[in-house]
Amino acid sequence: MTSALHESSIKSLPLLGRGKVRDMYAVGDDKLLIVASDRISAFDVILDDPIPGKGQVLTELTDFWLRKLAHILPNHSTGIQPEDVVAPDEVDQVRGRAVVVKRLKPILVEAVARGYLIGSGWKDYQASGSVCGIALPAGLQQASQLPEPIFTPAAKAEFGMHDENVDFAHVVKEVGQEMAERIRDVTLRLYGEAARFAATKGIIIADTKFEFGLDDNGTLHLMDEVLTPDSSRFWPADGYRVGISPPSFDKQFVRDWLETQPWDKTPPAPRLPRDVLEKTAAKYREALDRLLA
């Protein structure tokens, strides 16, 4: 397998923080260097074993979608090459896995679009017949396609905690009526266009999560990762069946293996065997290869 990057170490720039996957550095006062590591998390625990090549896949896919969807909404891209903002001996850490982006004020709402009933949406529907306050028809099954895509926001949780599904009124309270409607409408438009494109490649985008931010003029921008296996459920269309949870192009191998282990889902997690690492890396790569083919 190719070598993997668990954690970047860019000494030439101030480190602002590390998320589950990304490390963030300041580039002056108005830009950020974001490095996508090969870290992987499961059950909100960061694992010790990285997935080789994962960070490059996430970066390449996000770049692809940002260019493809740029006519809908401005995004955080600057066009500056990450190799140009780090020291020469740090270039290998950023090549193919980092971006230099505008420093935006993040909107603290997860903008989720769902076209299919799965995951927390399926659990909510089973309990109440609705998702995020949106009533759905009776009789839907797990993985059913919805009559039309829906906007199902979530409140950002503290690190290590699960995001909480909320209704549209919560978003209005956070950002105001006009901005809430703008976020909802653009989320559904981005999802719709991406889902139609992915369908031509034999991939169903069941749901996805977008992140938005504002520039100094208050203009809404698309930011962070976009339509990757980490932020979306990608299903192979030929494996889709209503009533079951379809296979997906993501870390399912990792989750499934961990479920077989005597582990209480608190750190530290068990070490992953080589075959699980290799299969997971291949799934991420397959999603990229299919979409960009």
Curated annotation (Swiss-Prot):
Gene3D superfamilies named among the record's database cross-references: ATP-grasp fold, B domain, Phosphorylase Kinase, domain 1
Pathway participation: Purine metabolism; IMP biosynthesis via de novo pathway; 5-amino-1-(5-phospho-D-ribosyl)imidazole-4-carboxamide from 5-amino-1-(5-phospho-D-ribosyl)imidazole-4-carboxylate: step 1/2
InterPro entries attached to this UniProt entry: SAICAR_synt/ADE2_N, SAICAR_synth, SAICAR_synthetase_CS
Documented EC number(s): 6.3.2.6
Gene Ontology terms: cellular component: cytoplasm
Record key words, sorted: ATP-binding, Ligase, Nucleotide-binding, Purine biosynthesis
Catalysed transformations (reactions): 5-amino-1-(5-phospho-D-ribosyl)imidazole-4-carboxylate + L-aspartate + ATP = (2S)-2-[5-amino-1-(5-phospho-beta-D-ribosyl)imidazole-4-carboxamido]succinate + ADP + phosphate + 2 H(+)
GO molecular function (one): phosphoribosylaminoimidazolesuccinocarboxamide synthase activity
EC top class, as a word: ligase
Taxonomic superkingdom: Bacteria
One GO term (biological process): 'de novo' IMP biosynthetic process
Family from the record: Belongs to the SAICAR synthetase family.
Record-given protein name: Phosphoribosylaminoimidazole-succinocarboxamide synthase
Protein source organism: Bordetella pertussis (strain Tohama I / ATCC BAA-589 / NCTC 13251)
